[in-house]
Amino acid sequence: GVIARRNLVLATGHSSSEEGLMLVREGGRQGVRRMVVTHAMNEPIVMSVSQMQEAATLGAFIEFVGGNIGDKDGSARMDRFADAIKKIGAEHCIVSSDLGQKGNPLPAEGFGAFLAALKARGLSDQDLDRVSRRNPATLLGLP
């Protein structure tokens, strides 16, 4: 397919968890080398850890988005994200802010708070560097 031939990134977008896995499976069959499960634990996707582990085994990066960690679900969401990253392995994960909307923190501030929240929940500096810098660079084909 076009994605494999042009070495593009296959992102699952806002597909359901089942559809996202289907895309990753088929992407692998088609020879796609760069894949990401977008917003894996957020609505409407809400993948289970076992689904994320399967996608990671198939070669996809699993994306966790911080959003506004100060909202009513922020602390519990950070707990879930940190736990999932530990179970899946930081080598298979990426993080992003998903910010920039009016009324939310600025992306740089929100992203810093997201990384601090993950560190407070036991992710090492090495893991944070991997999920925030090294893995995204790999996904994009950067050195």
Tell me what each language-model feature is.
Residues G1-V49:
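Divalent metal-binding pocket/active-site signature
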Residues T57-A76, C93, S124:
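Aromatic-anchored helix/helix-loop segment that forms the rim or "lid"
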Residues G110-P143:
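Mid-to-C-terminal alpha-helical segments outside catalytic/metal-binding sites
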